[in-house]
Amino acid sequence: MVDTTKNTKLFTSYGVSTSRTVSPEMAAKLISKAKRPLLMVGTLTLEPEILDRVVKISKAANIPIAATGSSMASLVDKDVDAKYINAHMLGFYLTDPKWPGLDGNGNYDMVIAIGFKKYYINQVLSAAKNFSNLKTIAIERGYIQNATMSFGNLSKADYYAALDELINAL
C-alpha cells in the first residue's frame, strides 16, 4: 500500500487554502460517488506508463476524458470517450454552472487531473478553487495545492503503484 499523503511540501504561498492529501482508495471512493466526473489529461500522459493507466481509469469508472495539449493524439485509438479542449479554456468553462459540458449534458461535479506540469495545472485549478464549488482531485506525481485533494510528492515507482491502487479500487 502506497502512502500518498506523505512528503507534502508547499512550494508556493499564493491562495488562501491548500488541498488535502488523499489516498488512492479514498480518491477512488470519491470518484465513484461523483455524478458527472471528468478526467482532464495533459501532455505527460504521452508516457506509455501513464497513458495505459489513464485509459484504465477512464474505462473502469466510465469517465469521459478532456484531452488537452497534444494528449488527444495518443487517445484516438484507445476506445475511450475523449474530446479535445484547451486546458485554460476548460478551467474557465468549469466555473460557469450553465456550461453544457463537452457532451452537452451539463457541467461536471468533479474533475480528476493527471499528466500536467505542476506550475501549469496549479494555475488552471486556481479558477475552479476560487470561483466554483467544483471538486478537483489531482492524481499527479507532485502535490498540487490548488486542487481540492491531491496525492503528495511521490517517486515514480510509488506514483505508478498509487495509480494501480486507484484503478483496482474503482
Curated annotation (Swiss-Prot):
Q: Does the keyword Ribosomal protein apply?
A: no
Q: Which UniProt keywords apply?
A: Methanogenesis
- State one Pfam family annotation: CO_dh
**Induction text:** Up-regulated during growth on acetate.
Domain of life of the source: Archaea
Q: In which pathway does it act?
A: One-carbon metabolism; methanogenesis from acetate
Question: Which GO biological process categories is it annotated with?
Answer: methanogenesis, from acetate
Family listed: Belongs to the CdhB family.
Assembly with partners or alone: Heterotetramer of two alpha and two epsilon subunits. The ACDS complex is made up of alpha, epsilon, beta, gamma and delta subunits with a probable stoichiometry of (alpha(2)epsilon(2))(4)-beta(8)-(gamma(1)delta(1))(8).
Function (record text): Part of a complex that catalyzes the reversible cleavage of acetyl-CoA, allowing growth on acetate as sole source of carbon and energy. The alpha-epsilon subcomponent functions as a carbon monoxide dehydrogenase. The precise role of the epsilon subunit is unclear; it may have a stabilizing role within the alpha(2)epsilon(2) component and/or be involved in electron transfer to FAD during a potential FAD-mediated CO oxidation.
Q: What is this protein called?
A: Acetyl-CoA decarbonylase/synthase complex subunit epsilon 1
Q: Where does this protein come from, organism-wise?
A: Methanosarcina barkeri (strain Fusaro / DSM 804)
Record lineage: Archaea, Methanobacteriati, Methanobacteriota, Stenosarchaea group, Methanomicrobia
Q: Point out the gene that encodes the protein.
A: cdhB1
